[in-house]
């Protein structure tokens, strides 16, 4: 019996910057842009839109550069990945969104963001909001995961965090002689790697691993007030795993969604120029989305 697999779509947002010599082409700027758009869609039709596909940035750039080999000098392309999900309206729920590809840790000007929706703020006022990644200029400890709770603890053991950063501290929570969790007291700064040791407390066998900010990030919900100033609704609306591209959205109640199809779009820059589809994922470029393909031409 044939098994029918429902696909999940990973959408690519393509932003190309193309240098060309205007004296070497009879095409207008508009015509050249349209030809570049068609070349990108031709790449999609040839290599994407199917299971077990692979996006290769350098090959797509060849399609762009070959639009007019006489006039086009070269191109640079930024690729963002986008996942879409349908929220439950007027109902509190949490969500897990899987890009299934590594994504770049955001900066102040380039970070994960979303399309708009409405939620109530803590004061009960309805706000037109969006998700955004909190840019962080340092790497602290974001989480400590207990991998073995151990046994026999009668007092709180000492938790020591070692690594190339400084000032991170944590405290164990003991329940029935075992370590139930380890709470972070001070996240510390400048860590790229860290280990943890658990000593004392009369117990034995407890083990834990440290997760640093380089591998994870935080989502917040924000809105812009009448003066166009950013206001934070929830500073801990979710988590980002940069290595796996998994987004966890904490419990939230959406009221409305600002899109005709009822979907919220999460967009982030891809970490690598080669993107392999996994499981039931189809990589595609949505030509009906006006933001999917943009081209900036520079004449030299």
Region annotations inferred by a language model:
Residues 137-139, 191-200, 213-219, 226-300:
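Surface-exposed interaction regions enriched in Ser/Thr/Asp/Glu
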Residues 1-51:
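Carbohydrate-recognition loop of C-type lectin domains
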Residues 6-13, 53-62, 80-86:
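A glycine-rich phosphate-binding loop feature that marks nucleotide/adenosyl-phosphate handling sites
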